[in-house]
Regions:
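Generic secondary-structure boundary signal with a strong preference for alpha-helix termini
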Residues: 14, 105, 368-369
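Generic hydrophobic-segment detector
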Residues: 5-7, 139, 334, 370
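Kelch-like beta-propeller repeat domains
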Residues: 9, 17-317
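C-terminal outer-membrane/trafficking sorting elements
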Residues: 323-396
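Positively charged n-region of N-terminal signal peptides that target proteins for export
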Residues: 1-4, 396
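Sec-dependent N-terminal signal peptides
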Residues: 3-13
Length: 396
């Protein structure tokens, strides 16, 4: 069955998709298929660094993504060792990457404690104070978040059977680490985290060999943790991000691979299923946010490592004026297998767009009721955009 999805409402066979809650496939990551990388965003650009490629070789390369051109460009390699399962974040226009393991084979690997700052203005790296946690032995499989101009690293592993529940705070202004209150969920690795209102939300992961679903919020001001509503299911190695004061957990593993997206609302302490990831199920993928849109990709799926990237449009991305115009365009039936009806009022053009953003068909000065034939198109998800000639995009 072909599925037509119009831009401001979406129906998918793979998940729950509602108003302004959908995914679009982007160009593949040109750094090659990989997993266990780190990512961060600076200004209007996204960055992916390190990881493990299809030859099972750890990496130290850095790539930058421009959403305006949907393209990638390689930048200066991370100095020091190649690494996997490191941490990354950005603060005040500077990217930070560190820790991890220097080899794919655990028995031949050394946990790393070095920490580096990337300046995009001159494409340069500078070494910063080493991570001092767990006696300075290094850490990998931990999670990181930022709050109030500081970075935080929580949990992880520092040996084959050595796990951490420590929380460390990094202050860029003085290049200094300080230990804070331990994570209350016990020792943990493969955790997930995101930031809302200058508070860190941390949970999930693996307690030695048991997948967990508990979640906690950390208040840097009081240096205290509080437990919040459990995540719906246990998992580790998920991707996470926050947009519009909402937190998101995507993908991961609970033994099998997962492809769902779950949103957390701190106002009501509740998790809600959102539109499932439009790519294949995977774990150890990366995520970053640009202009209130999330980009999630790479990772490892059932068929191996991935280079595909997908963009998520959350709810609340439309303004009041945009929302007031929704009633002027109706699309039905949806799903459809051949013909879709587009009833449009006061619009100068409508466009049919595929999931990669390619314009399939444009209709200028449309009739109030246009019938669009989809019978020759491959099955999938499509979008309708309504436009007027004053350059005002009614839906985006």
């Amino acid at each position: 069955m072909r599925i037509l999805v119009f831009l401001f409402s979406m129906i998918s066979l793979n998940g729950i998709c509602q108003f302004s809650n959908y995914w679009i496939e982007k160009n593949d990551f040109t750094g090659g298929k990989r997993e266990r990388s780190v990512a961060f965003s600076i200004e209007n650009l996204g960055y992916i660094c390190s990881g493990v490629n299809t030859s099972e070789v750890s990496l130290n390369d850095l790539w930058v993504y421009n959403p305006n051109t949907d393209s990638w460009e390689q930048k200066a390699n991370l100095p020091g060792s190649v690494r996997r399962n490191a941490i990354g974040f950005s603060i005040n226009g500077i990217g930070y990457v560190g820790m991890g393991m220097d080899s794919v084979i655990a028995s031949e690997s050394i946990p790393l404690n070095d920490f580096w700052a990337y300046n995009p203005l001159d494409n340069s790296w500078e070494q910063k104070a080493n991570y001092p946690g767990n006696g300075g032995t290094g850490i990998y499989f931990s999670t990181a978040f930022t709050a109030d101009g500081k970075g935080y690293v929580c949990g992880g592993k520092f040996g084959a059977n050595s796990y951490s529940n420590e929380l460390w705070e990094y202050k860029p202004s003085i290049d200094q680490w300080s230990q804070r209150t331990n994570f209350p969920g016990g020792v943990r690795y493969q955790l997930s985290s995101f930031t809302i209102d200058n508070k860190g939300y941390v949970g999930l992961g693996v307690n030695q060999d048991v997948y967990k679903k508990d979640f906690y919020v950390y208040n840097p001001g009081s240096n205290q943790w509080s437990q919040i509503q459990d995540f719906p299911t246990e998992r580790g190695s998920a991707s996470s991000f926050s947009i519009f004061n909402r937190g998101y957990i995507c993908l991961g593993t609970n033994g099998g691979l997962l492809g769902d997206l779950i949103e957390y609302n701190p106002e009501i302490n509740q998790w809600t299923a959102k539109c499932s990831y439009s790519g294949s199920e995977r774990k150890c993928a990366v995520s970053f946010v640009i202009n209130n849109r999330a980009y999630v990709g790479t990772g490892k799926g059932y068929s191996g490592k991935k280079d595909s990237m997908h963009e998520y449009f959350p709810e609340n991305t439309l303004g009041v004026q945009d929302i007031s115009n929704l009633s002027q365009t109706l699309i039905y039936p949806n799903p459809t297998s051949d013909i879709v009806n587009v009833r449009s009022y006061n619009n100068d053009a409508i466009q049919l767009i595929d999931s990669r953003g390619n314009i399939i068909q444009s209709i200028f000065n449309p009739e109030k009721l246009e019938k669009i034939d989809l019978s020759m198109l491959p099955k999938g998800i499509y979008f309708i955009k309504s436009i007027d000639f004053e350059e005002k995009i009614i839906l985006e």
